[in-house]
Amino acid sequence: MDFDLWLADLAKAADLCLKPYRHALRFSGEPPAVLGDSSDCALLIEARNDQGERCPQRDLELEIYRSGSELNLMISWVQDPEAPMLWHGSHAVWMQAVSGERCERPADGAALEALCRRIRALLGGA
């Protein structure tokens, strides 16, 4: 699979789940050698408003990694290192960023959980 096409598909998923913002994705560091292999992958999800202006306060970091045969995702807010972060493996778990302790889903958390489910579906075909 072509990386540009894959990133565009992930951006479309973010656009759908995180309205009204538009999104672009880029690798944060080295891309994996092959999509869907066991390599770890970190991406930045960059947000823009409907006028095309950057909204860095809405940017997310997405980590994709495998633990054994299980695919895991971690999403966190780039601009707010203390905001709860989402780990999504076989189910969604919200954690305090500082302590790693489990916490309640934040008010805007359902959209991020939906994004993780869409990303997992896209990666299933990778």
Regions found by a protein language model. Give the residues of each.
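Negatively charged, low-complexity tracts enriched in Asp/Glu with abundant Ser/Thr
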Residues: 1-61
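Serine/threonine-rich low-complexity intrinsically disordered regions
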Residues: 2, 80, 105-108
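Amphipathic alpha-helical interaction segments
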Residues: 14-15, 29, 85-86, 95, ...
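Basic nucleic-acid-binding interfaces
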Residues: 51-53, 58-60, 81, 91, ...
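Generic alpha-helix signal with a bias toward terminal, lower-confidence helices
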Residues: 57, 74-76, 99, 124
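Short, internal acidic amphipathic alpha-helical interface segments
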Residues: 65-94
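Ampiphathic alpha-helical segments that act as solvent-exposed interaction surfaces
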Residues: 90-126
